Amino acid sequence: MINEQIELFKATIKGKKIAVLGLGISNLPAIKFLHKFGAVITARDRTPYDELDNDKLEVVKAYCMDFVLGDGYLDNLDGYDIIVKSPGIPPYAGQIESAVKNGAHLTSEMEIFMTLCPCKIVGVTGSDGKTTTTTVIYEMLKAEGKKVYVGGNIGSPLLDKVEQMNENDWVVLELSSFQLQTMKISPDIAVITNLSPNHLDYHKGGMAEYINAKTNIFNYQNENGKLVINADNDVTSSFEGKQKGNLIFFTRRDYNKDIACSQIKDGKIYCCGEYIMDVSDIRIKGMHNAENYLAAIAAVYGIVDPENMRNVARTFGGVRHRMQYVRTVDGIEFYNDSIGSSPSRTIAGLVAHGGKIVLIAGGYDKKIPFDTLGEAVNRYVSVIVLCGNTSDKIEKAVKDADKDKKDIPIIKTDDFESAVKTAFAAAKGIDADGERVSVILSPACASFDMFKNFEQRGDKFIEIVNSL
């Protein structure tokens, strides 16, 4: 079957001057895709020529008419028909705004993909729980016998696969505020897990800008769309009435409001009044994971049979870097929760875990407050080991929240490996008193001060733990 959107795209893109900003994982296949349809491409990236990876350099030389590398890569953007921006580059950086005012169309690899995609799309966003919810939705659709692609912040880029997709397939996307901020298209089914302060270093308009970016996941839906939002979160619940299509809430409470919902009642999960599963069926523990399932169930309700939902819940063991058990050394359990890049995500993990905890935290400063983390550390943590740019801020938050004068040991280290080894030594000195003792890497911060991403940070943690 001919994809009419792709045929139209081919006709309009040929000969267009396109600046591709950022040579990240998604834009490299985008360059090849655009080149195939006759676009005239200039690649632009902050990395200097002599530091650019060989694979990126090969793509630039083979598919681009020109390239601009180094500090001035966002200068002189006038004259382009289209600017394809990498998610990590703010839309007001450099001369992007000026180019748009002068007629350039600002878009992204993800927006191009969603425009051309012939099949139904489920999009998931939120401050926490995105990846697990996205993966559970993917697994449930797959269990129903659907052909499913997963992408966005997880998986691999999908633009170069769009020509092989058809209207009977499904796509599940994890979408960040970075991706959504400039997007003018929404998925068929939009899920917002929760919203709390995050990425305020990126969003110069603060929390309001962050929230506005997130709402683009449903702003462009039509009356056939579905919006799934968290009724227990003050921000997301305020979106009620702003949707154009169908609304379904999810909540851990017994919800009496006359709106369709996925909810927990007496340890059982119901959706729109129908029994789906027991909470105890969910293999990955913690109420935050139960919430992820509530969101996923609401998204696929009416598409996936409840028995297939239950089978996924009973067999799915979680996602790498999300409270991932690594090993036990000298009676100390080690858990990799490197995805814990915000206080709320780290707190959820601490609440669910139990036992005596030595927490490794700290990292890149996203300009978000740590007061709630300080309270949680005083309640759930035996020792906290800090490293990274935010060490002093987290230390202050923990001390300020210590109303009961517990004086929880706070140990600051100079590097990541020292932090892991220090945490191990601290854990061995804890009186277990019959409880399990765990070292948990859940930094409550991004990794950019020491690592490329949270995956690299988690992999390094596993490497160090396996060497103990």
Task: Identify the role of each PLM range.
Residues 32, 36, 74-80, 87-231, ...:
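Phosphate-binding loop of NTP-binding sites
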Residues 2-17, 27-37, 147, 277-382:
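Nucleotide phosphate-binding/pyrophosphate-handling subdomain across enzymes
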Residues 40-48, 227-231, 360-361, 380-389:
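Short internal beta-strands
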Residues 1-108, 468:
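N-terminal leader/targeting and accessory segments in enzymes
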Residues 57-61, 371-437:
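C-terminal helical cap/extension that packs against the catalytic core
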Residues 43-45, 192-194, 230, 439-444:
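Short beta-strands and strand-loop turn motifs
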Residues 46, 70-71, 107-111, 244-264, ...:
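Beta-strand->loop->alpha-helix junctions that form or flank phosphate-binding loops
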Residues 40-45, 150, 172, 249, ...:
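Short beta-strand "acidic-cap" motif of Rossmann-like dinucleotide-binding folds
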